[in-house]
């Protein structure tokens, strides 16, 4: 389903970009994705119900999502027609990846053993920007006592580990190789 979601997301992204509605489409799709998470079983039931016609599934989309951007609604109708309305969250995640790549931004999780100050976060964000060539970093912080000291940053699939725990693990590996 991930490939299918990527295709829908790419088509919607291209239309939104061409019509200069990228931010509006992103916001609507994000809202719909988050709200649909609570109703995933019902959406799967709609997808798998053989007695529902394509028109009935389209009417459902129109009634529930009628205030969304027309391009989002049309995408949802196509999803419903093809019995894929339940993958709307995956479509959003794929759309979000395209959106973040376009704006050269990404999410970062900064883990440390204590709550970081705004100044410390700003310095880490600047380091992330230099390492990743991102122009914008959306930060979530997390306290992780297992790190012992220092910090660990996760951006996408990349991990930058400056923790004391990582240093100790690396040191232990060197000792093991030496023996």
From Swiss-Prot:
Taking the first listed entry, what is the main subcellular location of this protein, grouped into a coarse class? membrane
- Function text: F(1)F(0) ATP synthase produces ATP from ADP in the presence of a proton or sodium gradient. F-type ATPases consist of two structural domains, F(1) containing the extramembraneous catalytic core and F(0) containing the membrane proton channel, linked together by a central stalk and a peripheral stalk. During catalysis, ATP synthesis in the catalytic domain of F(1) is coupled via a rotary mechanism of the central stalk subunits to proton translocation. This protein is part of the stalk that links CF(0) to CF(1). It either transmits conformational changes from CF(0) to CF(1) or is implicated in proton conduction.
| Record GO terms (molecular function) | proton-transporting ATP synthase activity, rotational mechanism
What InterPro entries does the annotation carry? Answer: ATP_synth_OSCP/delta_N_sf, ATPase_OSCP/d_CS, ATPase_OSCP/dsu
Sorted alphabetically, the keyword list is:
ATP synthesis, Cell membrane, CF(1), Hydrogen ion transport, Ion transport, Membrane, Transport
- In Swiss-Prot or TrEMBL terms, this protein is called ATP synthase subunit delta
Location in or out of the cell: Cell membrane
Under the heading PANTHER family, the entry gives: ATP SYNTHASE DELTA CHAIN
What's its membrane topology? Peripheral membrane protein
The answer to whether UniProt assigns keyword Zinc to this entry is no
> Which Pfam families does UniProt cross-reference here?
OSCP
UniProt xrefs under Gene3D superfamilies = N-terminal domain of the delta subunit of the F1F0-ATP synthase
Complex formation: F-type ATPases have 2 components, F(1) - the catalytic core - and F(0) - the membrane proton channel. F(1) has five subunits: alpha(3), beta(3), gamma(1), delta(1), epsilon(1). F(0) has three main subunits: a(1), b(2) and c(10-14). The alpha and beta chains form an alternating ring which encloses part of the gamma chain. F(1) is attached to F(0) by a central stalk formed by the gamma and epsilon chains, while a peripheral stalk is formed by the delta and b chains.
Q: Which domain of life is it from?
A: Bacteria
Q: Does the keyword Flavoprotein apply?
A: no
* Cellular-component GO terms for this entry: plasma membrane; proton-transporting ATP synthase complex
Report the source organism: Staphylococcus epidermidis (strain ATCC 35984 / DSM 28319 / BCRC 17069 / CCUG 31568 / BM 3577 / RP62A)
Record family assignment = Belongs to the ATPase delta chain family.
SUPFAM superfamilies assigned: N-terminal domain of the delta subunit of the F1F0-ATP synthase (SSF47928)
């Amino acid at each position: 389903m991930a490939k299918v979601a990527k295709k829908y997301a790419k088509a919607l992204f291209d239309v939104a970009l061409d019509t200069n509605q990228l931010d509006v489409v992103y916001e609507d799709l994000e809202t719909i994705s988050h709200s649909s998470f609570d109703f995933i079983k019902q959406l799967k039931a709609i997808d798998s119900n053989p007695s529902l016609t394509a028109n009935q599934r389209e009417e459902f989309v129109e009634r529930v999502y009628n205030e969304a951007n027309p391009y989002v609604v049309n995408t949802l109708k196509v999803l419903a027609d093809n019995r894929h309305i339940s993958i709307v969250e995956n479509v959003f995640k794929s759309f979000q990846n395209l959106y973040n790549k376009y704006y050269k931004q990404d999410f970062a999780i900064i883990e440390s053993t204590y709550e970081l100050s705004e100044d410390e976060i700003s310095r880490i964000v600047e380091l992330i920007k230099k390492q990743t060539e991102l122009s914008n970093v959306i930060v979530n912080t997390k306290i992780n006592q297992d790190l012992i000291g220092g910090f660990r940053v996760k951006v996408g699939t990349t991990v930058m580990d400056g923790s004391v725990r990582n240093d100790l693990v690396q040191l232990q590996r060197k000792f093991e190789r030496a023996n």
